From Swiss-Prot:
Residues exposed to the Cytoplasmic side: 1-402, 441-454, 551-571, 660-706, 789-815
Predominant place of localization: membrane
Protein name: Vacuolar proton translocating ATPase 100 kDa subunit
Function in brief: Essential component of the vacuolar proton pump (V-ATPase), a multimeric enzyme that catalyzes the translocation of protons across the membranes. Required for assembly and activity of the V-ATPase. Required in both the contractile vacuole system and the endosomal/lysosomal system. Also required for cytosolic pH regulation.
Species per Swiss-Prot/TrEMBL record: Dictyostelium discoideum
């Protein structure tokens, strides 16, 4: 398994390689290397404008083809039945063997045909819409004129232009009885514009108009967007030519379609019959046009994604070739890139395959070159370890050959989550969720998922381990939905005389975790708080100590005398400082646990307190402790305090002095011409290769680093108390939900209330504990690893290894 390989502890050893590829074999060579995904090419033309590179025309050509494919895909997605036939991703489609010239010609033909069909269909749809709207205008107007026959057929009468044509209290029938002949404009507009349209008419005509409207029941299809639009028929009555021109302009500004409607009922009836016949004929033509378009798109669908895959890979190949240097004399391309050392043979095999495939007479050549640049960082992961590696990478990419925190994170991250979320019941529900995601792995892998589903699916194995550790720690806490599990039988008996619980066997305890009798005891919180708080301190000291040990592994990987200096002036004093104070406190905690200071015998004494002991260690060094854990405690505490204090100047002063000495020795070697390679490595690490050595800058940096560690040792240890705080919050919330929501309803004896209470309890547990509380525990575990653990050793200033890979390119495009 990959997590047992050395490449997961440290990044894979990388090698800079140089490729000499004949121009006729370049395309096939890049294609074969893309299938491997083992080389990260460098840009040898970074000072050349993108539009002046050798293969820019080929890239533009691929861009044009991609635009046409995007046009085809948009047309297909407008047809729901055809859209269902599209594959989920391009990785699963079969490669297309067609040549680019052939595809380009095919795309031009299809694009021209589809655009012509769309133009014809848009014209037909617009004409069809016009006829549909005219039919509704004739129908609605006929109904209105039948209700008011005298409105446009009466004799003209004088009417003041200064007063409204229709006052608010004057109905249209009254106007008809007066025999006033009015002009009218009728048309159709979007329904959502009608209120504003009517207000504009009223203000412009000063009320000298009358508007009648009716909603068209069927939806009108917009010929440009293809979406259905709600339309309304309107008719505006007015008096005078000047108002007619104003009303027409308002109608045009609102995008209304105006129709000439005869004022004679016989003419309206004849026109309606003609329009109905034309609608029937045009509908048949429109359907044939749509069928032709569907047939054209149906021929595109099976090959669309294979075409997209072909064009996308071709574009990536030419884009990669633009990174290469072109040797005009040799007519070859020269490429540089990083690759893992153990993969060079696979690359050479791919080069030979590409040479044979292209028919080139001169084989491609791979040469290994040396460089002072820092290589990219590459860790070999699988689907199980990749999620944990991404957790680390989110903080920062490891420096080249730096110890990888993900090795320990695979275990410690879910474990610390379990410490905060420890509950057998909730952990089991979380486990079911994780197993469900894992079981759907093959079905969901590679598909486009909702963001809320994608995140837990990507972290399904992290979720799986978190649930297992939650169950494990839940057994330690002896909590299942906040209630204890008396699996092995309590070790306490109730003494009927004293009314107190006593041990059945003084030489034996509850086999696994906390005795169930502690749950519900008067001093339950006191006991659990003490246990979890001390446990948090121990976990914190141990994890920070492992972090300092990881820094030792980083120092051992260095070359030259700086290795010994870092070990003696960084690792040793840091470990001494941490364990002289907080390590000693952890030892006292364990000592207090294992030593039977108090029993139910009269002659036993109360256990000593740890906090006053640590405070007295600093305030009264060398004095006799008031609280004694063991003989010779005063001398031990004095020695530990001395070691902690002396370690600070060791971290602060000694390393800058050694670095200054190494710098002068390096200068002398350069003068004598004996500058060895390991000193290049040393200078690379110290950051002063080819730079003037500044003692003040180095000393200030060391002061900052020392202060950060000393203060961080205190604050980081206190930060681990969040393990206790979140565990307490989870336990108390779970207990409240159980007792108040579920048990409170069950005790009422009403089955319906019990059912409702169970539903409310389950909903609250899922929403608050499984979602909100688990997210909170996840974020706190993330903080403990990124800050408290990784700042002891992790530089995190590396560069990710991103090789040219066809699989990665296709996957990113699918996203």
């Amino acid at each position: 398994m990959s997590f047992l390989r050395p490449s997961i502890w440290r990044s894979s050893p990388m090698q800079m390689v140089q490729l000499f590829v004949q121009i006729e074999a370049a395309h096939d060579t890049v294609d074969e290397l893309g299938k491997l995904g083992l080389i990260q090419f460098l840009d040898d033309n970074e000072h050349v404008n993108l539009f002046q590179r050798n293969f820019v025309n080929e890239v533009k050509r691929c861009d044009d083809m991609e635009k046409k494919l995007k046009f085809f895909e948009d047309q297909v997605k407008k047809e729901p039945k055809l859209q269902k036939l599209l594959p989920d991703n391009m990785l699963s489609v079969v490669d297309d063997d067609s040549q680019m010239d052939e595809l380009e010609g095919r795309f031009d033909e299809l694009e021209s045909e589809l655009k012509q069909v769309n133009a014809n269909q848009e014209t037909l749809q617009r004409n069809y819409n016009e006829l549909i709207q005219l039919r509704h205008v004739l129908t609605k107007d006929s109904v209105f004129f039948q209700e008011n026959p005298n409105l446009i057929e009466g004799e003209g009468h004088e009417h003041s232009a200064r007063s409204p044509l229709l006052a608010e209290d004057q109905h249209v029938s009254e106007v008809a009885k007066q025999g006033v002949k009015l002009g009218f404009i009728t048309g159709v507009m979007n329904t959502d514009k009608m209120p504003q349209f009517q207000r504009s008419l009223w203000r412009t005509t000063r009320g000298n108009n009358y508007v009648k409207d009716a909603r068209i029941e069927e939806e009108i299809i917009d010929p440009q967007t293809g979406e259905e639009t709600a339309k309304t028929v309107f008719i505006v009555f007015f008096q005078g030519e000047r108002l007619q021109q104003k009303i027409k302009k308002i109608c045009e500004s609102f995008g209304a379609n105006i129709y000439d409607c005869p004022d004679n009922s016989f003419e309206r009836s004849n026109l309606l019959q003609k329009v109905t016949v034309r609608i029937t004929d045009l509908y048949e033509v429109l359907q044939r046009s749509k069928d032709h378009k569907r047939q054209t798109l149906a021929g595109i669908v099976p090959r669309l994604y294979s075409w997209k895959k072909k064009v996308l890979l071709e574009k990536s190949i030419y884009h990669t070739m633009n990174l290469f240097d072109y040797d005009v004399g040799r007519k070859c391309l020269i490429a540089k890139g990083w690759t893992p050392k153990d993969k060079i043979e696979e690359i050479q095999l791919a080069l030979r395959t590409a040479t044979t495939r292209s028919g080139a007479l001169v084989p491609s050549v791979l040469s290994i070159i040396k460089t002072e640049g820092s290589p990219p960082t590459h860790f070999e992961t699988n689907k199980y370890t990749s999620s944990f590696q991404e957790i680390v990478n989110a903080y920062g990419i490891a420096h080249y050959r730096e110890v990888n925190p993900a090795v320990l994170t695979i275990v410690t991250f879910p474990f610390l989550f379990g410490v905060m979320f420890g509950d057998v019941g909730h952990g089991a529900l979380l486990l079911l969720s994780a197993l469900g995601l894992i079981s759907l792995e093959k079905k969901l892998a590679g598909k486009k998922l909702n963001e809320l589903i994608q995140m837990p699916f990507d972290g399904r194995y992290v979720l799986f381990l978190m649930s297992l550790f939650s169950i494990y720690v839940g057994f330690i806490y002896n909590e299942c939905f906040s209630i204890p599990m008396n699996i092995f039988g309590s070790q306490y008996n109730l003494n009927s005389t004293t009314g107190l619980y006593t041990y059945q066997h003084t030489d034996r305890v509850y086999p696994v975790g906390v005795d169930p009798l502690w749950k519900g005891a008067p001093n339950e919180l006191v006991y659990y708080n003490s246990f979890k708080m001390k446990l948090s301190i121990i976990f914190g000291v141990v994890q920070m100590s492992v972090g300092i040990c990881f820094s030792l592994l980083n120092y051992l990987n260095q070359k030259g005398p700086i290795k010994i200096v870092n070990i003696l002036t960084q690792f040793v004093p840091q470990m001494i400082f941490l364990w002289s104070i907080f390590g000693y406190m952890s030892v006292l905690i364990i000592l207090k646990w294992v030593v039977p200071y108090r029993s139910f015998e009269v002659d036993k004494v109360d256990p000593p307190f740890i906090l006053p002991t640590i405070i007295a260690m600093f305030l009264s060094p060398g004095g006799t402790p008031d609280v004694v854990f063991f003989s010779g405690q005063g001398a031990v505490q004095t020695a530990l305090l001395f070691l902690a204090l002396i370690s600070i100047p060791v971290m602060l002063v000694i390393k800058p002095l050694f670095m200054k000495r190494f710098h002068f020795q390096e200068v002398e070697r350069k003068k004598l011409g004996h500058h060895e390679e390991e000193h290049d490595d040393e200078a690379l690490y110290t950051g002063h290769h080819g730079e003037e050595f500044e003692m003040g800058e180095v000393f200030v940096h060391q002061v900052i680093h020392t202060i950060e560690f000393v203060l961080g040792a205190v604050s980081n240890t206190a930060s681990y108390l969040r393990l206790w705080a979140l565990s307490l919050a989870h336990s108390e919330l779970s207990s409240v939900f159980w007792e108040r929501i579920l048990i409170g309803q069950v005790e009422r004896g009403n089955p319906f209330l019990a059912f409702v209470g169970f539903g409310a309890w389950l909903g609250a547990s899922v929403a608050v504990l499984l979602l909100m509380e688990s997210l909170s525990a996840f974020l706190h575990a993330l903080r403990l690893h990124w800050v408290e653990f990784q700042n002891k050793f992790y530089i995190g200033d590396g560069v990710r290894f991103i090789p040219y890979s066809a699989t990665r390119i296709l996957s990113e495009d699918d996203e």
